[in-house]
Amino acid sequence: MPDFLIDANLPAKIGIWQNQRFIHKVTLDPCWDDEAIWQYAKTNNLTIISKDKDFFIQQLLKGTPPKVVHIKFGNLKLNDFISVIENCWNEVELLLINHTLINIYSDTIEAIK
């Protein structure tokens, strides 16, 4: 069973995301809008991973579930993006145990309960 739903605006080919715990939106339904993604994640108890600030706002307004990992750094070369994610992912997963919203910046992580 997956634990994380990766939004369409993120690359699916990140090494640490290449296992059964992660599912990419385009493999479910590439036509889904944000509300469909939100409802699927909520129904299936998945954490949404996205750069889309709309999920950040929905999480603040609607609460959990689902939890949201919001990637809040600008466009990077793919290798740099992968490096940032791989360097912080273990901490992100630990923070998700007690937090509902995680903001990943290029140089820090912010966790909100």
PLM regions: where:
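Nuclease catalytic cores that cleave nucleic-acid phosphodiester bonds
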Residues: 40, 56-80
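C-terminal structural segments of small proteins and small subunits
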Residues: 74-110
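N-terminal first-folded block
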Residues: 2-47
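Glycine-rich nucleotide phosphate-binding loop and flanking beta-alpha elements
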Residues: 12, 55-57, 110
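Structural signal for conserved beta-strand scaffold positions within catalytic alpha/beta enzyme cores
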Residues: 24-27, 70-72, 103, 111
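Acidic, metal-binding active-site segment of PIN/NYN-like and related structure-specific nucleases
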Residues: 45-59
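A general structural motif
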Residues: 1, 45, 65, 98-99
